[in-house]
Design a protein with these regions (language model features):
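A glycine-/polar-enriched beta->alpha junction
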Residues: 36-46, 53-68, 114-119, 141-144, ...
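Amphipathic alpha-helical coiled-coil scaffold segments and their short linker/junction regions
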Residues: 35-41, 91-135, 272-331, 473-486
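Solvent-exposed loop/turn segments connecting transmembrane beta-strands
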Residues: 51, 312, 336-346
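Acidic, low-complexity, intrinsically disordered peripheral segments
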Residues: 7, 71, 76-99, 450-486
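Transmembrane beta-strands of outer-membrane beta-barrel pores
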Residues: 76-80, 158, 337-341, 353-355, ...
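Amphipathic alpha-helical coiled-coil segments
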Residues: 47-62, 185, 189-210, 219, ...
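Transmembrane beta-strand segments that form the barrel wall of outer-membrane beta-barrel proteins
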Residues: 72, 328-339
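Periplasmic alpha-helical coiled-coil/stalk elements that build and connect Gram-negative outer-membrane
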Residues: 2-4, 29, 57-59, 180-302, ...
Length: 486
C-alpha cells in the first residue's frame, strides 16, 4: 500500500510539473510583437541585410577607381640564345684597312727602298690577305643567363571616355537598389504576417462559432430527448436534432483542424513553436480615413516596387553611357622602376583606340537604349497595375465596412428569431427544423462576421502594401471607432 501511494504521489507530481511546463512554454503574442520578431529574426531579413551590406561594400570598394595603380613585380627567368654573326664584311674592311696602311707606309719609304718597294708591298698585302682569310666568314654566338628582376610599376588612367565615373555611378545605384529591395521584402513579410496572424484569428473565431453551435445543438438534443420521453414530440423530431448535433460536431472538428493548421503556419513563420494565444483581434474600422484620389496620386513616391523599377531605368541609362564610352579612345600614364643594382626606369604616356574587335559597338549602344526604353515601359505598366489593385482593395475595404454594420443588425435579428423559434417549439407551435435553421443562421452570421472582418483586414493590408505604406498598418488597429471581433 505504501509503495502504491508513493507511486501515485510521484505520478501526480510528474503530471503537475508537465502541466506547469506546458503553461510556461505557451506564449501569447500581439501583432506588433509578431511583426517586430519577424522583421528582426527571419531568414529573409537576415539574407537581405547581408545582400544590402554587400552592395554597399562594393560601392565603397570603387571609390578609389581612377587613382594610380602601383604594383610590385618580380620576374625570375633564364634564357638561352644562339646567334649566327656574319663576319664577311668585317674581314673585307679589316683587310682593306691593313693593306691601305701598309701601302701608305711603303710609299713613304719609297726613296729608301727603291725598286724593292713594289715587291715588298705585294708580299705584305698577300700576307695580310692570307691572315685575314683565316678568320671564318661567320661565327655562332651563344648567350645564356639567369635573372631575377624586381620592379615597381605604376599606371594611371588619364581619360577613359567616362567609364570610371559611370562605374562608380552604377555601383552607387546598385547599393540604393539593394536598400529598396530590402524595404520591399520587409513590406512583403509584413503582408505575409498579417495574412498568417489574422487567418489564425479567423480560424479561432470559426472554431468558437462552431463550438457555440455544437453546444447549442447539444442542448437542443438533450431537451428533445426529454420532450420525447414526456411524449411531447415524436422520435422523428428528436432525430432531427440528433442529426443537426452530429453535423455541428463534424463542423467543429473541421474548424479545430483549421485552427491548429493556421497556428502551425504562424509559428513556422515566426520560427517558434510556443505561440498559442493571439492578443490582437480581428477588427473593422468604422470610418475610412484614406482618400482614394490621394492614394492614387501619391503611391509612386511611397511604393518600393516603383522606386526600384525607376532605379532599374537609371541603371539602364548608365549602361547606355558605358556602351558609348566604350567607343572612345583611352589615355593613360605609365612608369616602371627597376629595384636591382642597375636601377633602370621608364615613364611615358600611352593611348589606346580600338579599330576592330569583332564586336559591333554601335549595336551594343542600340541594345542598351532599347533596354532602357523597355524599363521605362515596364515601370509605367506596373503603375497601371498598382492603380488597379489600390482601387479594388479600397472598394473591398469599404464594402467590408458597410457589410459589418449590416451584419451587426442581422446578428441581433437572428438572436431574436432563435429565441422566438425556441419558444414556439416548446409551445408546440413550431417545428424542430425551424429551431435548427434559426440556430444555424445565428452561427452562420457569427462566422460571416469573422470572415468579413478578415476580408477587411486583408483588403486594408493589400491597399497599404500597394501604396507602399504597409508599415502604418499597426496604427489602424488602435484607431477610434474600431470594432473588434472577439
Amino acid at each position: 500500500m505504501q509503495k502504491s501511494a508513493e507511486a501515485a504521489r510521484r505520478g501526480a507530481l510528474f503530471t503537475a510539473s508537465m502541466l506547469f511546463s506546458s503553461i510556461c512554454l505557451a506564449q501569447s503574442i500581439s501583432y506588433q510583437q509578431a511583426e517586430q520578431n519577424a522583421l528582426r529574426d527571419s531568414y529573409t531579413t537576415q539574407a537581405h541585410q547581408a545582400l544590402q551590406q554587400a552592395s554597399q561594400l562594393e560601392a565603397e570598394a570603387l571609390k578609389g577607381l581612377g587613382l594610380p595603380r602601383v604594383d610590385f613585380n618580380v620576374r625570375a627567368y633564364a634564357f638561352h640564345n644562339e646567334l649566327d654573326v656574319p663576319l664577311g664584311a668585317l674581314k673585307n674592311n679589316l683587310e682593306q684597312t691593313l693593306s691601305n696602311g701598309v701601302s701608305s707606309k711603303i710609299d713613304e719609304w719609297q726613296g729608301t727602298l727603291g725598286s724593292a718597294a713594289d715587291p715588298l708591298k705585294d708580299s705584305l698585302n698577300q700576307t695580310i690577305h692570307d691572315g685575314v682569310g683565316l678568320i671564318p666568314d661567320s661565327s655562332q654566338v651563344v648567350l645564356e643567363d639567369q635573372v631575377i628582376r624586381p620592379t615597381v610599376s605604376i599606371t594611371m588612367p588619364l581619360y577613359t571616355g567616362g567609364l570610371t565615373s559611370i562605374a562608380k555611378e552604377a555601383a552607387n545605384l546598385k547599393a540604393q537598389r539593394s536598400q529598396l529591395n530590402s524595404r520591399q521584402q520587409q513590406d512583403l513579410q509584413r503582408f505575409e504576417l498579417i495574412q498568417a496572424y489574422f487567418n489564425a484569428q479567423l480560424q479561432k473565431q470559426l472554431l468558437a462559432s462552431s463550438q457555440f453551435n455544437l453546444d447549442a445543438m447539444q442542448a437542443h438534443y438533450r431537451n428533445a430527448l426529454k420532450l420525447e420521453q414526456q411524449g411531447f414530440i415524436s422520435k422523428g423530431q428528436r432525430m432531427q436534432f440528433e442529426v443537426a448535433r452530429n453535423n455541428a460536431e463534424r463542423a467543429h472538428q473541421n474548424a479545430d483542424a483549421g485552427y491548429k493548421s493556421s497556428l502551425f503556419q504562424l509559428n513556422n513563420l515566426l520560427q517558434s513553436s510556443q505561440i498559442t494565444d493571439l492578443t490582437t483581434p480581428l477588427f473593422v474600422n468604422s470610418a475610412q480615413n484614406l482618400a482614394l484620389n490621394n492614394l492614387l496620386k501619391s503611391f509612386p513616391e511611397h511604393s518600393a516596387l516603383i522606386q526600384k523599377m525607376q532605379m532599374d531605368t537609371r541603371l539602364a541609362n548608365a549602361n547606355v553611357k558605358a556602351q558609348n564610352a566604350a567607343k572612345k579612345p583611352s589615355l593613360f600614364a605609365f612608369g616602371e622602376y627597376s629595384l636591382d643594382d642597375k636601377q633602370n626606369w621608364i615613364v611615358g604616356v600611352g593611348a589606346r583606340y580600338n579599330l576592330f574587335s569583332g564586336i559591333d559597338k554601335s549595336k551594343n549602344v542600340q541594345a542598351a537604349e532599347l533596354q532602357r526604353y523597355a524599363s521605362e515601359l515596364m515601370t509605367e505598366r506596373a503603375k497601371q497595375e498598382i492603380e488597379s489593385v489600390i482601387y479594388a482593395s479600397y472598394s473591398e475595404a469599404a464594402a467590408a465596412q458597410q457589410s459589418d454594420q449590416l451584419l451587426q443588425r442581422n446578428l441581433k435579428a437572428a438572436q431574436e428569431n432563435l429565441r422566438i423559434q425556441e419558444l414556439s417549439f416548446k409551445e408546440d407551435m413550431g417545428t424542430a427544423a425551424q429551431v435548427i435553421d434559426a440556430q444555424n443562421a445565428l452561427s452562420g452570421l457569427k462566422s460571416e462576421t469573422a470572415l468579413n472582418a478578415y476580408k477587411y483586414v486583408m483588403s486594408l493590408a493589400a491597399l497599404l502594401q500597394s501604396h507602399g505604406s504597409i508599415e502604418q498598418f499597426q496604427t489602424y488597429i488602435n484607431q477610434p471607432n474600431t470594432r473588434y471581433v472577439r
